[in-house]
A protein has these predicted regions:
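Conserved Rossmann-like nucleotide-cofactor binding loop
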Residues: 136
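S-adenosyl-L-methionine
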Residues: 2-100
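Beta-hairpin (beta-strand-turn-beta-strand) motif
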Residues: 110-113, 133
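Conserved small/polar residues in nucleotide/adenosyl-binding loops
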Residues: 144-151
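Conserved SAM-binding loop of SAM-dependent methyltransferases across substrates and taxa
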Residues: 112-125
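Conserved SAM-binding loop
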Residues: 141
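Conserved class I S-adenosyl-L-methionine
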Residues: 102-109
């Protein structure tokens, strides 16, 4: 069973302290033989956040080859399983743009936003709307689809 993230976890993982914690967790093997020692180290340094850190790093590793920029994503096991492969999402976005130039696309089950990321990168898509019943997944989705100050 995978870890269930909270909105508080998302806020921590995107904070300066959380980003440093993710760097630390990423430097650990997080394999079956090392897991007890790795958990102990993370718990000693980031008590209360160790499970979220381990889930994020192990999911990032599994997402390589499936999701663009996997090394920077916040993912749960369930979200990773349900996320559309970036190549497939890119092809779908291109097809929507070709068939419906200037479209505003609504992904009603956007989860962590894998398809929305590709839609926002595709010329000819006028806008995207994402919705989901899970507030944690929406919080994660907003990280990847909201314009940043430098955009």
């Amino acid at each position: 069973m995978s870890y269930t993230f909270s909105v508080r976890d998302v806020a921590f993982l995107r904070s300066r302290h959380g980003i440093k914690a993710l760097e630390t967790a990423s430097s650990l093997a997080l394999t079956a033989p090392s897991m007890i020692a790795d958990i102990a180290e993370l718990r000693a340094r980031y008590d209360g956040h160790d499970a979220a850190l381990i889930e994020t790093v192990t999911c990032r590793r599994r997402a390589r080859g499936k999701l663009r920029g996997a090394e920077d994503l916040l993912l749960s096991d369930e979200a990773l399983q349900q996320a559309t492969n970036s190549v497939v999402a890119q092809q779908r976005a291109a097809e929507i743009s070709r068939r419906f130039p200037g479209a505003v696309v609504h992904d009603v089950t956007c989860s962590v936003g894998a398809e929305l990321v590709e839609l926002t990168r595709t010329a000819g898509i006028a806008g995207v709307i994402g919705s989901d019943i899970d507030p944690v997944r929406l919080a994660i989705c907003l990280l990847y689809t909201s314009p940043s100050p430098r955009d």
